[in-house]
Amino acid sequence: MDAHLENGAGIDVVLVTGLSGAGRGTAAKVLEDLGWYVADNLPPQLITRMVDLGMDAGSRITQLAVVMDVRSRGFTGDLDSVRTELATRNIAPRVVFMEASDDMLVRRYEQNRRSHPLQGDQTLAEGIAAERRMLAPVRATADLIIDTSTLSVRALRETIERAFGGGASATISVTVESFGFKYGLPMDADMVMDVRFLPNPHWVDELRPRTGQDPAVRDYVLGQPGAAEFLDAYHRLLSLVVDGYRREGKRYMTIAIGCTGGKHRSVAIAEALMQRLQAQHGEAQLSVRVLHRDLGRE
């Protein structure tokens, strides 16, 4: 059984927050579809009251998700007090922080022709920057950070479902994400590894148009001197980290593997690493998926 359910007298609490335009509404809809009771834009001081109602005998609320944003007065300061107050009820709420790159947020606001809640007389970019600064302390203590910059609605739904669709699951959810350094670092990565030390298939004419998912490219990358040794060593390191996460009660982990463009080397290594993690730990202990962030961008 989920530790949050065991400690919380039968109620699991998730606080969904993050940057405006990063997908809080979509996350809320997915949670609602999964059977969670969702309260949107509930002021922090009313959260404990809602939890108390859910803990009352006869209440059918066992999974409560609260969507919060900076328009709630005293948001950042009150959030800590809410967590402290819930701790007195033996409830440790999980905080989900939604974010996206500045460029993507600007694009979304321009497409929807909406103003940012903190924009005021400033530019849209300045409003986004102000919110990012304001929410930095919240992001630093979040249990799960979801970067929606390159996620489709379907991919976001799958991410939420994996994290919260099985309330009784005690597995650790691991995402192995390939990316290209020239497109920037993944904002939600817990660990980043650079595999540009391996020869680049881009310079092999017959391999250039293919990707790291192609058997010929995979064999080329994994057959390079040092590739197998690197996989062995990095897999051992990740196994230690996974065990540490489990001891600390953490449930989510994103491992980013980068090469120049995110097309060949990082893709092949990410696929191989995912297979090794699955083979060693099994689905009962580890839920592993692979995500190729920049595949198809070239």
Swiss-Prot record:
The keyword ATP-binding applies. It holds the Pfam family RapZ-like_N. It comes from the Bacteria. Keywords: ATP-binding, GTP-binding, Nucleotide-binding. SUPFAM superfamilies: P-loop containing nucleoside triphosphate hydrolases (SSF52540). GTP binds at residues 69-72. GO terms for molecular function: ATP binding; GTP binding. ATP binds at residues 18-25. InterPro entries: P-loop_NTPase, RapZ-like, RapZ-like_N, RapZ_C. Displays ATPase and GTPase activities. Belongs to the RapZ-like family. NCBIfam families: PRK05416.1 (NF003828). This is Nucleotide-binding protein MAV_3359. It comes from Mycobacterium avium (strain 104). The lineage of its organism: Bacteria, Bacillati, Actinomycetota, Actinomycetes, Mycobacteriales.
